[in-house]
Amino acid sequence: MATDVVMAMGGFPKLSQYNMVASLGIEIVTPVPSLFTFNINETTLHDLHGVAVVDAKVKLVGYPESYNGPLMVTHWGISGPAVLKTSALAARWLNEKAYVNTVLVSWVNLSEEELRQQLNENIRSNPKKMISNLGLDGVPKRLWDFILSRAQTPVSKQSADLSKYEFNKI
């Protein structure tokens, strides 16, 4: 005989809907939403809807774990396996926070040092290329231009003319 029973009854948001199961003496754990996309208030990000990356890292500020995987920008925020896994595994934690939190996205699953090395190598190999045409492995052009814009780096600048300050902002 089983000592535990798991009933995955998605779409039953009210505890009263579990009365039949509770009448059997089974303890009901309050359900919380899971497997949802993240709405992002940063409207400039919405301009990137449709942009996808293969191996992003998603981290909720204050939550101990981060999750990697494909990520896509939508009209309202971000979605994809990395986001859905984060929302599933942090579901109770997010519920306690009333679903308001800051999410950090590393668009490529590389350390800061690895990113610096890759960008330096790209600059050394292509000093005459405009920085907007340089990019990073795994970063779509529209996303790269967005990153440059957020770093206030002119997209028409030749990569060899990038100042240390501009490099660090990227």
What function would you assign to each model-found segment?
Residues Q17:
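Rossmann-like NAD(P)(H) cofactor-binding subdomain of soluble oxidoreductases
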Residues A22, E27-K85, A90:
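Mid-to-C-terminal "cap/lid" subdomains and adjacent gly/pro-rich loops that border
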Residues M7-A8, K59-I170:
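Residue-level recognition of phosphate/Mg2+-coordinating polar/acidic sites
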